[in-house]
A protein has these predicted regions:
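Conserved inter-motif catalytic segment of the P-loop NTP-binding fold
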Residues: 2-4, 10, 18-19, 24, ...
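Phosphate-binding/switch region of NTP-binding enzymes
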Residues: 19, 34-35, 40, 44-45, ...
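Pre-Walker A (Motif I) flank of P-loop NTPase domains
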Residues: 29-33, 68
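Hydrophobic positions on the alpha1 helix immediately C-terminal to the Walker A/P-loop
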Residues: 46, 50
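Short, polar/flexible loop-turn hinges at active-site or ligand-entry regions and domain interfaces
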Residues: 61, 124, 204-206
Length: 228
């Protein structure tokens, strides 16, 4: 049996620790992030725009960004569709933004593929995974959706934390909602342990609520922010 690794309060209080590196000031840091919303409402457009802005170090929602290499795994799209979107969004594609259109499954090849990518492109600081459903074991998810959501994203979070990067997961929310207007499944299962969480809903006010441990952006800047 492995012994619990404990640290006393005084040691922790004075221990020099690195703070999370922000990619979008006050909104997005390294670790795991989730963009959740109904299908066909423009999540992939938003992700591509974020890729372009952050890879060039340009502002997002009026907030400063940290320039870094970006990988976008656009698993639900083909090359021509992403090309078309990019041509509408920019005239100068950044060289430090890279795309992938297929990858292995979670718990099988994906983690190794991400680590190999980080070895090949060590300045990568952000990886978008669009969408979670394309890389997970759907058979296992049907057995216990809550537990599978937690397992899948906890593994990705550890991978992001170990390498000091941000893995940004795009997820289609389910149509059913609970009594507090939250989508069932991943949003409920991971609201607390996996920051930050950005839900986007169809047919409602154009607001993107942000929730996460490291989010401190002023809500007057156009986002609803709450630290957990």
């Amino acid at each position: 049996m492995n012994k619990l690794q404990l640290i006393d309060a005084d040691t922790l209080y004075y221990k020099p620790l690195a703070h999370p590196k922000m990619l979008i000031d006050g909104v997005l840091s390294d670790g795991l992030a989730i963009l959740a919303g109904d299908s066909k409402i423009g999540k992939s457009w938003m992700v591509l725009w974020l890729c372009l802005q952050i890879s060039r170090g340009e502002a997002v929602w009026g907030l400063p960004t940290r320039k870094t290499d970006v990988v976008y795994l656009a698993l639900e799209d083909r090359e021509w569709r992403v090309q078309q979107r990019m041509q509408e969004l920019t005239d100068s594609p950044p060289e430090n933004l890279r795309f992938g259109f297929s990858c292995g499954q979670l718990g099988a090849e994906l983690e190794g593929q991400i680590e190999e990518t980080l070895r090949e492109f060590p300045t990568t600081g952000l990886i978008f995974l669009d969408t979670l459903q394309m890389v997970r074991d759907n058979a296992s998810a049907k057995v216990n959706a809550y537990a599978q959501d937690y397992k899948d994203l906890s593994g990705l979070k550890k991978l992001a934390d170990d390498h000091g990067i941000c893995i940004f997961v795009v997820h289609h929310t389910r149509k059913e909602r609970d009594s507090s207007n939250n989508e069932h499944g991943i949003c409920v299962a991971l609201r607390h342990p996996i920051p930050p969480y950005l839900p986007i809903r169809k047919g409602r006010a154009p607001v993107t609520p942000l929730k996460g441990c490291d989010i401190y952006a002023d809500s007057n800047r156009g986002n609803q922010c709450a630290g957990l």
